[in-house]
Curated annotation (Swiss-Prot):
Coiled coil: none annotated. It comes from the Bacteria. It catalyses: alpha-D-glucose 1-phosphate + UTP + H(+) = UDP-alpha-D-glucose + diphosphate. Belongs to the UDPGP type 2 family. Pathway: Carbohydrate metabolism; nucleotide-sugar metabolism; Capsule biogenesis; capsule polysaccharide biosynthesis. It comes from Streptococcus pneumoniae serotype 4 (strain ATCC BAA-334 / TIGR4). NCBIfam families: galU. GO terms for biological process: capsule polysaccharide biosynthetic process; UDP-alpha-D-glucose metabolic process. The gene is cap4C. This is UTP--glucose-1-phosphate uridylyltransferase. Keywords: Capsule biogenesis/degradation, Exopolysaccharide synthesis, Nucleotidyltransferase, Transferase. Its EC number is 2.7.7.9. GO terms for molecular function: UTP:glucose-1-phosphate uridylyltransferase activity. InterPro entries: GalU_uridylyltTrfase_bac/arc, NTP_transferase_dom, Nucleotide-diphossugar_trans.
Amino acid sequence: MTSKVRKAVIPAAGLGTRFLPATKALAKEMLPIVDKPTIQFIVEEALKSGIEDILVVTGKSKRSIEDHFDSNFELEYNLKEKGKTDLLKLVDKTTDMRLHFIRQTHPRGLGDAVLQAKAFVGNEPFVVMLGDDLMDITDEKAVPLTKQLMDDYERTHASTIAVMPVPHDEVSAYGVIAPQGEGKDGLYSVETFVEKPAPEDAPSDLAIIGRYLLTPEIFEILEKQAPGAGNEIQLTDAIDTLNKTQRVFAREFKGARYDVGDKFGFMKTSIDYALKHPQVKDDLKNYLIQLGKELTEKE
């Protein structure tokens, strides 16, 4: 097994029911944060981290993802002819990425989506990046979380899962770790991984947040994994099994995480990102200040 992490897997086969009717014909991952689809943030994080090849696991009604990262000759020609070089650079940026696509024919859970990447990954360590979690998108100087996991792997040669503290009453929405003692420099040894525990049963408030660096042995486990929570093949359950034969670490993320998996999180992310966007930040800031005054006066 090579020691270098070169490949990333982005599961994008979910139905996106929380955003209906917008996602009836449009992939949820293509919903824009101001002017950039959420999946492009994920791909850019991977490339910034040094990932060389990316596999996107898609499903039905996800063709728009492939189209976004494909060339569009008519659009590119039009922008070039009109001298819109800045826009042309933005379009070119989406087509210069080494992306591959495979379809998950039946939505049987995250674990099954990752299993579709077995042939692509081969006998190499790899990263799984979930599209609902955007990391540090308003801080260009931050070290990407994926890069942090890759750096950990260079030292430990072990699977490493990203975690961060969440409110105790929200742990049932996440996979949660039971750490072995105190972490060292934000890196924890893990006793067990538990998928979506009830708050009273949660071993900690350290929740898995959508970035995983895994060794290829995970595939053999996923092939035998019985359905878990929600009657789906749960990646967290497979990682817990892996942890019984290989050490699995948890890296505590201390940056800014944005959850775009629900409407409020998506709106909050859009506002925070827009307040850093050079084309709209000033107007938006003034609007929010005025809106705040109006709302205060109505109370």
